[in-house]
UniProtKB/Swiss-Prot annotation:
UniProt keyword annotation of Secreted present: yes
Organism: Arabidopsis thaliana (Mouse-ear cress)
InterPro entries xrefs: Expan_Lol_pI, Expansin, Expansin/allergen_DPBB_dom, Expansin_CBD, Expansin_CBD_sf, RlpA-like_DPBB, RlpA-like_sf
Keyword vocabulary terms for this entry: Cell wall, Cell wall biogenesis/degradation, Membrane, Secreted, Signal
Annotated protein name in UniProt: Expansin-A16
């Protein structure tokens, strides 16, 4: 059967549009180049002092982040947009305090290291803008440097986050205010935007409340819920109908994660 040329003329431009639209979106997160900064530590031997934090993850043990975590300075934290991002870090250029062989550690951004403007940036105000600084959980700091060092020079780079299981969506709030905590994000690890769809609604954008807590004022009670997450590398993961219509506030639902 012959193909109508008019159909080809209609389809071909659409194909080109879709091709160019998707061309710049990577299949997997590729990370970034090596950069320099400094690192200190906090939270105690068991990292109990790192719980909670400005990303809103709460108990980092039960959420799966463990002790391989970091608080980021203002320039790196980016008003919470870097929450969930993963970094490879190694102690460098300080043979007195760096461990032999300059081993790498991999950490997830879970907190904010606030500036101390009463102190100079090179003597106590380590997290003052515009410095790039990592305040590591103590156990992970000790994997790259000696305790007595206090502060060490490092090299760091963004890397893909490797997580076990799917993206987790914890729904808090009440009937007229939904606060969704999103955790365990693989790939880029961070979240650029997210949206929710009820079984009786279209897709609705959520707004960042703080850290990785995202809010909606829509009434979603009694509807099954789907979620869509887009990370900073523009990849999108859609989790269809993961919350049943009888979901309750405080429950966590697991969706589809990004490929790594």
């Amino acid at each position: 059967m012959a193909i109508n040329p008019l159909i080809l003329l209609t389809i071909f431009p659409l194909f080109l549009l879709l091709s160019f639209t998707d061309a710049g979106i990577p299949r997997v997160f590729s990370g970034g180049s090596w950069q320099t900064a400094h690192a200190t530590f906090y939270g105690g031997n068991d990292a109990s002092g790192t719980m909670g934090g400005a990303c809103g993850y709460g108990n980092l043990y039960s959420q799966g982040y463990g002790t391989n975590t970091a608080a980021l300075s203002t320039s790196l934290f980016n008003s919470g947009q870097s929450c969930g991002a993963c970094f490879e870090i190694k102690c460098v250029n300080d043979p007195k305090w760096c461990h032999p062989g300059n081993p790498s550690v991999f950490v997830t951004a879970t907190n904010f290291c606030p500036p101390n403007l009463a102190q100079p940036s090179d003597n106590g105000g380590w997290c003052n803008p515009p410095r790039s600084h990592f305040d590591l959980a103590m156990p992970v700091f000790l994997k790259i440097a000696e305790y007595r060092a206090g502060i060490v020079p490092i090299s760091y780079r963004r890397v893909a986050c490797r997580k076990s299981g799917g993206i987790r969506f914890t729904i808090n709030g009440h009937r007229y205010f939904n606060l969704v905590l999103i955790t365990n994000v693989a790939g880029a690890g961070d979240i650029a935007r997210t949206s929710v769809k009820g079984s009786k609604t279209g897709w609705m954008s959520l707004t960042r409340n703080w850290g990785q807590n995202w809010q909606s004022n829509a009434v979603l009670v009694g509807q099954s819920l789907s979620f869509r997450v887009t990370s900073s590398d523009r990849r999108t993961s859609t989790s269809w109908n993961i919350a049943p219509s009888n979901w309750q506030f405080g429950q966590t639902f697991v969706g589809k994660n990004f490929r790594v």
